[in-house]
C-alpha cells in the first residue's frame, strides 16, 4: 500500500537516528573536555620560560616570548604582570653576571648576543615606563615602579661609580613628572624612595632640573613644573650636616662619593627648586610654597639671595600672599643675614582698612609679633605702627580691636621710648586753652607710606581713649589698659586671636587686671 511503512524499515531508521544523536553528544562532550585537558597554567608556563633562560643561553629567545606576554594590553590577562616580574629577575641575573657587557677581544658572535640582550633590556624598560607606569591600571603602575627601582639597584651593584643618567632612573623620574597631577604613583614614589634615601633625592634633584631645562611646550611645562613642585614639597627634612646623609638605596657610601658633600647635595636641591620656580606657578601653589618657605625651602639654598625675586613677586600679589612673602624675607634677614632695607616699609603698607576684617588677621598678628620683636627698632618706626593700628581700630570689628590693644601694650613694654604717646599733655596754659577752644590737628600723616616719616612719634593715642567708650563692653574694658599702670609684663596674643564677633560676645564681661 502506498503510504505505509514496513515496521522493520521504520525501526531501522529510528535506530540510525538514535545512533547519530549519541555520536553528536559524545563529540560535544569531547569538545567541552578538550580545553581543560590542554589548559596551561600561566604561572607555570612563565616560570618554565624563566627557568630555561637562567639555565641555558640556548633559551634566550624565551625573553622575547616573555616580552610579548608582558605587552598584552588585556587588563584581564594575569600573565602580563607575571611575565614582567619574571623578566625583572632574568635581567637582574644577566646584570649580576655581566652577560650584557661587551669586553675587549670578545668574539663577533658573542657581541651580537650581547647587543641583542641590550635591545631586549631597553624594550623591557619601554614596556614598564610607557605601557605600565603611564597606563591607567593602578596595579601595573605600582608594579612598574617597584621593578624599575629594582633594576636601578641591580645596575648599581655592577659598577664602582654608577651612572644614574644612563640607567632607567632618569627616565623613571621624567615619566613620574609627566603623569596627571592627581596620579597616586607620584606619592608612592615620594613615600617609598624620594623621602627615604639620600641618593634617590640627590639624583631626583638632578633629573628634575635637567628635564625642566629641556624645550617643553607650554602645557607640558606647566604639568611637569606642577608635579615637580608637588614632589619637592614632600620633603620636610633638610640635612643640616654631613652626618645627616646616611641613607643609601644603591649601597654603601663608597658608591655615592658626591653625596658626602653637603654643599653639593644642597646645590642640586637649589637648582631643582629654581628650575621649578622659573616655569611659573599658580596663586595657590605660591601660597603653599610660602607657607613652608622657612623650614622646607630656604634651608636648601646656599645662595638665599636667589630667592629674592620670587619673594618680591609674591609680595606684589597682595593680600595674604604679601604677608607670607614678608615672612620669608624676615627669615632670610634674621637667619641668613640678608639685607633688605625696605622690609618694614613694605610691612607698613599692608596695614590698610581691610586688615582687621580679613580672614588672615590672626596670622598677620602672629607674624607682626615676630617682626617687631627686636628692641633695636627705631622708636619713630614703632610709633608709626602703633598709631596706624590705633587709627584702623576706630573702624575695626570688635574681634579685631581686642587683638590690637594687647599688641600695643606689648609694643610699649618692648619700646619704652614710645610710651609718652599715651600721656602727651600740654602744660602751657595758653596753648591748653587754645586746644580746648579750637582743637588741634593730629600731626600723624595717615597717607605717608614711609613709617619713618609719618610723625607718629609726635602724636598721641586719642583713638584708644575713644575706644574706651565703645558700644561693646569687652572692647571698652580692654581699651582702658592703655590708661592704667603697666604692671603686667605682657599679654599672650594667642588668648585674643581667632575669635569672631560672636566669640567676643560669649566671653562675657572682660576683667582686666
Task: Please state what every model-predicted region is.
Residues 1-6, 513:
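Intrinsically disordered, low-complexity mixed-charge
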